[in-house]
């Protein structure tokens, strides 16, 4: 069955017709995007960022990302998950992104038989070891072991030292080039290399410089998905 595009809201790509399956897929994507853009505290940033992302993808962003991952990931493939934002004033990592990352890792194992590898600040390593066990994954800092054994999760502490970050990023990419890289609330520096929190304070010294790895992997053509709030 085909449906005229004129009767479908938001057909950015200008299709003349849409099949029933395509319409259902689009509706699922629209609903997921609508949930993600809920802003009960009136923060405002989510909708601004969403507008730019939607203009880039030309379709619901959640479904766009899901389809990209489905095309990229196969059984046994490594997937890097960059996560861990260290907060002031207590200088400890926030946990909402970390919980999301560990559940995402479990989903990648169940859906694809993938080998998720968490890349985080040293502050978060112990939490991921414990949370990994909670969701039924065996956690290893030795990546060779994580890649070899089933139902496993690798964890890598990424440096906070800007000078050391490029070498570690290259070493990781050379050792294990992932099928995809996903960032879940991982902090990134601005054009001047300064890292800020949500209220504009300089947190450069607190944050893992995993954005250097992100850029290294993008330069190598690795499919990438970024998630934030």
Predicted regions and their residues:
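Short, Lys/Arg-enriched N-terminal segments with co-localized hydrophobic residues
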Residues: 7-17
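Positively charged, low-complexity intrinsically disordered leader regions
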Residues: 16-78
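Short, glycine-rich nucleotide/cofactor-binding loops
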Residues: 54-56, 78-79, 83-100
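Short loop/turn segments at strand-loop or loop-helix junctions that form parts
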Residues: 81-86, 183-187, 228-229
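Histidine-anchored nucleotide/phosphate-binding helix
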Residues: 94-113
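A short helix->loop->beta-strand "cap" motif at the edges of active sites that frequently abuts
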Residues: 113-114, 219-224
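Short internal beta-strands
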Residues: 115-123
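An acidic, phosphate/nucleotide-engaging active-site surface
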Residues: 130-214
């Amino acid at each position: 069955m085909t449906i005229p595009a004129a009767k479908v809201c938001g057909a950015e790509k200008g299709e003349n017709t849409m099949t029933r399956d395509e319409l259902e897929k689009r509706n699922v994507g629209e609903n997921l995007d609508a949930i993600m853009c809920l802003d009960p505290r009136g923060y405002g940033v989510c909708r601004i960022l969403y507008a730019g992302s939607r203009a880039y993808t030309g379709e619901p962003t959640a479904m766009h990302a899901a389809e990209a991952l489905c095309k990229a990931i196969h059984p046994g493939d490594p997937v890097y998950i960059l996560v861990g934002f260290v907060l002031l004033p207590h200088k400890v990592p926030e946990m909402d992104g970390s919980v999301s990352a560990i559940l995402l890792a479990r989903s990648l194992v169940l859906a694809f038989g993938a080998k998720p590898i968490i890349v985080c600040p040293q502050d978060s390593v112990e939490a991921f070891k414990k949370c990994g066990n909670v969701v039924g994954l065996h956690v290893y800092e030795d990546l060779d072991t994580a890649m070899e054994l089933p139902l496993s999760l690798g964890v890598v502490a990424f440096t906070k030292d800007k000078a050391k970050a490029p070498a570690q990023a290259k070493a990781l990419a050379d050792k294990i080039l992932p099928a995809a890289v996903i960032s879940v609330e991982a902090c990134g520096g601005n054009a001047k290399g300064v890292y800020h929190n949500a209220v504009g304070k300089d947190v450069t010294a607190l944050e893992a410089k995993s954005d250097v790895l992100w850029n290294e992997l993008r330069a190598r053509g690795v499919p990438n998905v970024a998630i934030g709030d």
